[in-house]
Amino acid sequence: FFYVNPLEVVPEACQKDQRKKHVKPIRQKWFACACCPPNLARLFASIGGYLHFIRAETLYTNLYVTSTSEFTFQGLPIKLHMDSAYPFDEKIHISLSLPRPMEFSYAVRIPAWCADYHVLINGKICAGTLKDGFLYLHRCWRDGDEVELTLSMPVRVVRANSLVRENIGKSAICRGPIVYCMEQTDN
């Protein structure tokens, strides 16, 4: 089920097409299927699993949020601290606390919108291997190692797909993952 977006509704089309009879041309005060409150509670309970995850011998960071996470990796307790003002700032600082040196791959997510990024490990440029949206950094990690990830966020214009009739000629202005809204009265 998708809620109706009143900014995209053509009232005449809803009235003439029986298949669209359920589509309301104005925002409803309440929906009979109130799924937001329980989904929000579920999100808070599971947010840690969205930030980082482990698969085989690789530790992944998927979301960039100021946080401290503790987990067991390769049978050892490790701590990962992240400082970030993402998505408003391009730089993400990550530090690792390890009980001893450990060799493994640490994979950081590079969003599809990001065409230019760079990584410093302990102040030195690191290339890594980009695969399936993650930059893999394989090395012997030591306690106190610092990773600085910079995701370049130039302002860009994203044009709508011309095959979507209702969106022909429409564009969005974006910076990083943020899509800016310009409503009808402002355009």
Please give the residue ranges for each predicted region.
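A generic structural signal for beta-strand entry/edge sites
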Residues: D89-K91, D132-F134, G144-E146, K170
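C-terminal beta-strand-rich structural cap/linker in extracellular carbohydrate-active enzymes
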Residues: F104-A107, L137-S152, R156, E183
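Glycine/proline-rich low-complexity spacer/linker segments in large multi-domain proteins
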Residues: F1, L151-N187
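Solvent-exposed beta-strand/loop surfaces of large extracellular or lumenal domains
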Residues: C114-H138, V157-L163
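Short, glycine- and charge-enriched coil/turn segments that flank and shape catalytic ligand pockets
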Residues: P99-E103, N122-K131, D143, N187
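Aromatic (Trp/Tyr) and acidic
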Residues: F1-I110, C114, H118, L130
